[in-house]
Amino acid sequence: MKSKHLFSLASVAMFVVVIAFGVRIYRVGDSARKEKAHWKKLDRILSEANFEGSYLLAKDGKILISSGRGDLSYDNKKVSDEKSRSTDPENDPNKIGRESTVAINSLTKQFTGVAIYQLANEGKLSLDATIGTYLSDCPYGDRITLKQLLEMKSGLPDYALEQALRDKYGDAIYSGMDPASLRADVMALTLKETPGEKFEYTNTNYFLLGLIIEKVSGESYENYITAHLLKPIGMRHTGFDWNLAAVRPFDPSKQGDGREFSHVFTFSAGEMTSTVLDLYQWQKYLYGGGFPGIVPQELFTDGGYHMGLNEKDGVFRHAGATHLYRSNMLYDTKTGDQVILLGRSPESDLNELTTELKEWIDELETAH
């Protein structure tokens, strides 16, 4: 009788273990299915946005995925398609990947902003000083401070949108013009608003900051940024001039490679090129306190725009757009999450796509 009772207990125990094991298998399988579906959703999001370029998503400071979509060149694609080449992105050197260099447009502005803060911390300039302190030949130099330039409150118009300036240079906007001539034209602009009163995004502000960096440091803008910002982080694939970028701009009007603004024209407001991997390191370094005294989350006290960045609720982001390139970057200081998009999709809304991808990262936790 006793042995019979023990046998019954053993049977029940085994049954419970089997059931529990079965439930565990079901849960693991269900979790795997959810996760697989979530990754399929990512591909769908990118496809529906018609995104072409490189992208990187990071959660808790760690890269989830870094890859690319599309061909490096549309002109090369036409030739290659005629030869029926393989389109395997893992083996095709003509496909955009995570190490492909792309024009980053106005993401350049945060590098300019950090450089200004570096020079201020070294006592070489003051954010409260006027432009004229450093650029003595600037007609409006005694009315605008460096801080107002950083915060887009100078009251100046956007030189890049001035029709008279575009008419003057014509094709040289793409092929390149004399830097001294462009500098003189930017200096000749007249105020639209009273400095300090109104926020208005304008490339002129960061163009002028680039000139101040050159004047104060005694180096060219490009040399200063390379030596003091890029090299300390190891950003070996970041540079200047879109002509040297691997990803060629796409011109929808001719369904082929197009031309982008000259790096002389965009200068310190938007001339840089980079990769998603380099920018991932940049954001980790910047928000992690790599530059002493220049931690964005400590400098931004009430949100808004400053030093080439927008901030709201601890999330920093900025967009970039030139003639044919588009870019967008996000960093969440609360989680270390990152979204980096470097594309040549002039008809895509990368602001909306960045928001969608951040939501996808947030939802990843529930997909496990």
Residue ranges of model-derived segments:
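Residue-level detector of secondary-structure transition/capping positions
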Residues: 120, 138-139, 154-157, 232-233, ...
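Helix N-cap/coil-helix junction residues
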Residues: 51, 124-125, 219, 235
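Short, surface-exposed loop or secondary-structure junction motifs
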Residues: 144-323, 327-328
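Alpha-solenoid HEAT/Armadillo repeat architecture
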Residues: 136-139, 214, 343
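Active-site-proximal loop and beta-strand segments within enzyme catalytic domains
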Residues: 71-200
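Catalytic loop of the DD-peptidase/beta-lactamase superfamily, centered on the K-T-G motif
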Residues: 2-11, 15-68, 84, 260-368
